[in-house]
Each structure stands twice: as structure tokens, then as C-alpha cells.
């Protein structure tokens, strides 16, 4: 009798668990989702496959692709001989060390960014969204080749590309991008959705966009941009500065566009995303990115101040721009830096003069919506 009682108790518990599972499955529409979408999880419009090119679901993404395609450039437009002369004759040994420290991770930084676009393309399947992502990813290839061209122009050895792994500040930046904490498990995702109705996979995607696009493209790269542009500010390495200015125009467009995609993903799926948890994770990611960048800045400035630019100047700037990225995503700023601490950056970028690749004559880089005020 005692064993029968235990068996009945066990069967009763299983029946209760089964009833709860069935109830949750019905509540979360698991069967309906599977029947219509081939997945137990709710359909995400941004990730839905569409056979035909039109009508567009996201015409703004097509417009961003079109804008981007009106602003092509190539490092081959530039004759780098003046920069070679500056390197050999006008830069101090401390300045050369400073420049090399930045270049050690500069190309790798965009290699890491390109990985983000490869991952985005596997997720977002609407044709106009993919057009935007393809265009942005292709431009990252130009950035990588251009930054590599800077290294080759200065006749630095190929080992330069691996040297970042020897420096903790650089290696930590690289490894953080691919940290496992940005991945959700299949089992965890299933039970969280079954019991509570939120999809951790969507949260991970949103955090990943914030990581790659808002904080790596939009903060970390800008730290290096500013340190390199300080040479151009003083009439040095001007062709390098030209490449940086072109890259800034691109990265600004990429960052703003991807933060808009972030907002679209969250708004369209807010019933399946823990908004408070997402905000906390995005803010935590921003803090970590700034912390890692502080270490990199200290390493770069290990030889001291560089022509009216200090490590504290750059640290203040990245906090300012981090606030701007957070505000664009709809979050409150993290840091007390309200005004741009480096106004010369804005002055330098608002009056660029470039070279037309086909005509080889000066022209303003003022195409489509890349014109106008810079967003910082």
C-alpha cells in the first residue's frame, strides 16, 4: 500500500507538471507558432523571409543603403608620400610609438566589427534590410584594407597585425567581443519562453547590436579616430587623416542606422523582451567598453601627452560619445560629460576636402544624408 501511495503521488505530480506545461504551451501559442511559422517561438518580422523584393517592409533600410552607395571612396585615391615624409622627418620617437600602438589594433578593430555584420546577415532576412547590411559590411572591408594600407605605407612589418595579442589592453578588447556571456542556451530559451513568455534569444540579438554597432563602431573606433586625427590637426599625416575622416562618415552612418534597427527590433517585439533587463545589460556593456577603452588609451599614451592631447581628453570624449549612443537608443546617459570636450574634432570634420577617385581633383564629401551636422 505504501508503494502504491508513492506511485499515486508521483503520477499526481507528473499530471500537475503536464497540466502546467500544456497550459503554458497554449498560453504562449507554441502549437500555433509551430503550425504557421515552423518554430515554437513568435515570428519576428525583421527576421522573416520574404521571397519578393517589394513591397518593402522597411523602406528606411533601403534609403540607408542608397545613401551609403552614394558615398564610395578608396584609399587608392590618395598619394601617401607626404605621410611617409612626416613619419621619417617630422614625428618624434614618442609620436611614432604612439602611432604604432594605435595601428597595432586599428585594423583588427574593424575585422571584429565585420564579424558583427556577418552575424547580422544570418539573422535579418528582409531583402532591403540585407541590402543595407551587405553595403555596410562591404565598406568595413574597405576600412580594413585602408588601415592595413597605413601600416604598409609606413613599412611596418606584417607581425604588427598580431602584436595586439601581446598587450593585455588590446587583447581584452578583442576577447570581450566574443565573450560567451552574449550567447543564450537552447534549453534556457525554451523554458523562459514556455513559463514566462520572453525570448532570451531576442534579448541577446539586441545586446549584440548594441555591442557591435553602438559601442565598438560607435565608441571604441572613435577613440582611435580622435587620437589619429590629432596628427592631422597639427598638419601631420594628412592623408591618414583623410582616410579617418572618410571612415568617420561611414561609421557614423552605420552606427545611427544600426541603432535604429535596434529600436525597431525592440519595439516590434517588446511583449517578448524584458525591457528592464535589456536596458541593464546594454548599460553594463557600455560601462565595460569604456573601461576597456580606458586601458587602451593609457597604453597609447604611455609616452606622455601628444601635441595638446592627453589621455584624460580622450577618456572624456569617449564618455561623451557613449552618452550620445545611449540616448539614441532611448536610455539615460551614464556619465556627467554633457558638452563635447574636444570641439576641434567638430571643426576638423565639418570642413573636409577630399579627392575624387575618377577625376583626381578636390571635392567635398557631401553626398546624400551624410551631409549636415555631425551627431556629436
From Swiss-Prot:
Binds 2 iron ions per subunit. InterPro entries: Ferritin-like_SF (IPR009078), RNR-like (IPR012348), RNR_small (IPR033909), RNR_small_fam (IPR000358). Its cofactor is Fe cation. Fe cation 1 binds at residues 110, 140, 143. Its EC number is 1.17.4.1. The active site is at 147. The keyword Cell inner membrane does not apply. One of its GO terms (biological process) is deoxyribonucleotide biosynthetic process. GO terms for molecular function: metal ion binding; ribonucleoside-diphosphate reductase activity, thioredoxin disulfide as acceptor. The keyword tRNA processing does not apply. Keywords: Deoxyribonucleotide synthesis, Iron, Metal-binding, Oxidoreductase. Gene3D superfamilies: Ribonucleotide Reductase, subunit A. Pfam families: Ribonuc_red_sm. It catalyses: a 2'-deoxyribonucleoside 5'-diphosphate + [thioredoxin]-disulfide + H2O = a ribonucleoside 5'-diphosphate + [thioredoxin]-dithiol. Fe cation 2 binds at residues 140, 217, 251, 254. PANTHER family: RIBONUCLEOSIDE-DIPHOSPHATE REDUCTASE SMALL CHAIN (PTHR23409), RIBONUCLEOSIDE-DIPHOSPHATE REDUCTASE SUBUNIT M2 (PTHR23409:SF18). Ribonucleoside-diphosphate reductase holoenzyme provides the precursors necessary for viral DNA synthesis. Allows virus growth in non-dividing cells. Catalyzes the biosynthesis of deoxyribonucleotides from the corresponding ribonucleotides. Belongs to the ribonucleoside diphosphate reductase small chain family. Heterotetramer composed of a homodimer of the large subunit (R1) and a homodimer of the small subunit (R2). Larger multisubunit protein complex are also active, composed of (R1)n(R2)n. This is Probable ribonucleoside-diphosphate reductase small subunit 048L.
Amino acid at each position: 500500500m505504501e508503494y502504491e501511495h508513492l506511485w499515486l503521488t508521483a503520477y499526481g505530480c507528473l499530471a500537475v507538471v503536464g497540466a502546467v506545461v500544456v497550459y503554458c504551451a497554449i498560453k504562449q501559442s507554441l502549437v500555433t507558432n509551430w503550425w504557421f511559422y515552423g518554430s515554437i517561438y513568435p515570428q519576428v518580422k525583421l527576421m522573416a523571409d520574404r521571397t519578393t523584393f517589394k513591397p518593402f517592409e522597411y523602406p528606411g533600410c533601403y534609403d540607408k543603403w542608397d545613401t551609403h552607395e552614394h558615398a564610395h571612396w578608396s584609399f587608392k585615391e590618395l598619394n601617401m608620400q607626404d605621410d611617409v615624409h612626416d613619419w621619417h622627418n617630422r614625428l618624434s620617437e614618442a609620436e611614432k610609438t604612439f602611432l604604432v600602438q594605435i595601428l597595432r589594433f586599428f585594423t583588427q578593430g574593424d575585422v571584429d566589427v565585420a564579424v558583427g555584420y556577418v552575424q547580422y546577415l544570418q539573422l535579418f532576412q528582409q531583402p532591403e534590410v540585407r541590402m543595407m547590411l551587405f553595403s555596410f559590411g562591404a565598406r568595413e572591408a574597405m576600412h580594413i584594407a585602408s588601415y592595413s594600407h597605413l601600416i604598409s605605407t609606413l613599412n611596418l612589418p606584417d607581425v604588427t597585425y598580431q602584436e595586439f595579442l601581446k598587450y593585455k589592453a588590446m587583447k581584452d578588447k578583442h576577447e570581450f567581443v566574443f565573450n560567451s556571456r552574449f550567447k543564450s542556451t537552447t534549453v534556457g530559451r525554451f523554458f523562459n519562453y514556455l513559463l514566462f513568455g520572453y525570448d532570451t534569444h531576442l534579448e541577446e540579438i539586441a545586446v549584440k547590436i548594441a555591442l557591435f554597432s553602438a559601442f565598438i563602431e560607435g565608441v571604441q573606433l572613435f577613440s582611435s579616430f580622435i587620437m589619429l586625427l590629432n596628427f592631422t590637426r597639427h598638419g601631420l599625416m594628412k592623408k591618414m587623416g583623410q582616410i579617418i575622416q572618410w571612415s568617420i562618415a561611414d561609421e557614423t552612418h552605420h552606427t545611427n542606422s544600426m541603432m535604429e534597427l535596434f529600436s525597431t527590433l525592440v519595439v516590434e517585439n517588446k511583449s517578448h523582451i524584458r525591457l528592464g533587463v535589456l536596458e541593464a545589460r546594454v548599460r553594463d556593456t557600455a560601462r565595460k567598453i569604456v573601461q576597456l577603452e580606458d586601458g587602451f588609451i593609457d597604453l597609447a599614451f604611455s609616452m606622455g601627452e601628444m601635441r595638446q592631447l592627453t589621455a584624460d581628453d580622450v577618456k572624456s570624449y569617449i564618455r561623451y560619445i557613449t552618452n550620445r549612443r545611449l540616448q539614441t537608443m532611448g536610455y539615460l546617459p551614464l556619465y556627467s560629460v554633457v558638452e563635447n570636450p574636444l570641439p576641434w574634432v567638430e571643426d576638423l570634420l565639418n570642413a573636409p576636402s577630399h579627392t575624387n577617385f575618377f577625376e583626381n581633383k578636390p571635392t567635398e564629401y557631401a553626398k546624400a544624408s551624410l551631409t549636415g551636422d555631425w551627431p556629436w
